[in-house]
Amino acid sequence: MGKSLNNVPQAPLDVQFNSNGMKCSAYLYRPATEATTPIIVMAHGLGGTRRMRLTAFAERFVAEGYACLVFDYRYFGDSEGQPRQLLDIKSQLEDWKAAIAYARSLDKIDPNRVVIWGTSFGGGHVLATAADDNRLAAVISQCPFTDGFSSSMAMNPITTLKLTGLALKDKIGSLFGAKPVMVPLAAPSGHTALMNAPDAYSGYLALMPSGSNIPNYVAARFVLDIIRYYPGRKTSRIQAPVLFCVCDTDSVAPSKTTLRHASHTPNHEIKHYADGHFEIYVGEAFERVVRDQIDFLKRIVPVK
């Protein structure tokens, strides 16, 4: 039997919501129904935007009857904020809270059936956010960043030293109004970048829409913050059910550390994938993970 016509995906609306005085841009997907529905709030990882394969996930979710709000963090994509490409952890966590509040305010949305979905660095953000929001119905954390120290140790020590030097230069310069010192997000092995594992550069480029000019760099000062960010340590406080989608050969967010933090989550499920950090967004790997996520959603937050 085919899908109900009520769940035929509709073209998303381009919407904006306020986060600490600035506007965040988002796609709002709604299933074609008059019924009140759950909503999935979604955002990307390290320097990622809503256009980098998140729409593929949202289209599959809305086809199953879920509304989706897919947003860009401040300073990235179509959202406001200067300087551009400023990756600030505190700001991004504020954006998550603002996005959830906006989602709860929408008509035909059940404010008590809000799911948050994050991937990579965003996969860590949803864990930190859920620890502080007991109203959330569920969490999906995909190939999540959970531990700054472990992720830093996965990097070549020489690269770490170079990045630290650039970060200090950027941070000091920012105090005197200098332009940001930028570092690449992804680069081939041997090059200085936040991600330079063998699969990083080609995998990152595969997320880019055809013909796009999404910047592949961020302000270097972020390096000074990442090692002090441990969203995985908050998992014991999360009350909502959490689905962890773990890439067993993850070169960016070590799976062993993710599994350790996941084990402390009171209500959790773990799905393993024999894929790398970037493979999970495309092809058969994407099909496997999105199928598992839909199964989780249907069981935990069913569409009425």
Cite the ranges covered by each PLM segment.
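N-terminal cap/lid segment of alpha/beta-hydrolase-fold proteins
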Residues: 2-35
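The serine-hydrolase catalytic nucleophile loop
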Residues: 47-59, 73, 256
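Catalytic nucleophile-loop/oxyanion-hole region of alpha/beta-hydrolase
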Residues: 50, 76-111, 115, 283-289
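Conserved alpha/beta-hydrolase
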Residues: 60-80
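Alpha/beta-hydrolase-fold enzymes
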Residues: 127-207
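Short beta-strand/loop motif that positions the catalytic acidic residue
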Residues: 238, 244-246
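Conserved alpha/beta-hydrolase "acid-adjacent" motif
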Residues: 251-257
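Catalytic active-site module of serine/aspartate enzymes centered on a nucleophile-bearing elbow/loop
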Residues: 273-304
